[in-house]
Amino acid sequence: MATKKAGGSSRNGRDSAGRRLGVKKADGQYVIPGNIIVRQRGTKIHPGVNVGIGKDHTIFALTSGRVEFLTKRDHKIVNVTEIASA
């Protein structure tokens, strides 16, 4: 009698969906108040002028203007520079 013992079940085979983190508005892009600029875990990029930060470290625009990424000392900073009205 040819029989085979039942194989054990694998404990692998799961994965979680990606969290959709990263830069949402590029350097020089126009934003309006409330636009999300960066989604991140921790403050990899710090908020600068006219930029707010949420409790999950999301960086968002407080005013209309152009996005500007800078590096000051060891920190990456994002600002929103207002465009002068004509």
Curated annotation (Swiss-Prot):
GO biological process, one term: translation
Keywords of the record: Ribonucleoprotein, Ribosomal protein
Stretch list, region Disordered: 1-22
Recorded GO CC terms: ribonucleoprotein complex; ribosome
SUPFAM superfamilies according to UniProt: Ribosomal L27 protein-like
Source taxon at top rank: Bacteria
Annotated NCBIfam families: L27 (TIGR00062)
Record protein name field: Large ribosomal subunit protein bL27
GO-annotated molecular function: structural constituent of ribosome
InterPro entries: Ribosomal_bL27 (IPR001684), Ribosomal_bL27_CS (IPR018261)
UniProt similarity note: Belongs to the bacterial ribosomal protein bL27 family.
Leader sequence segment: none
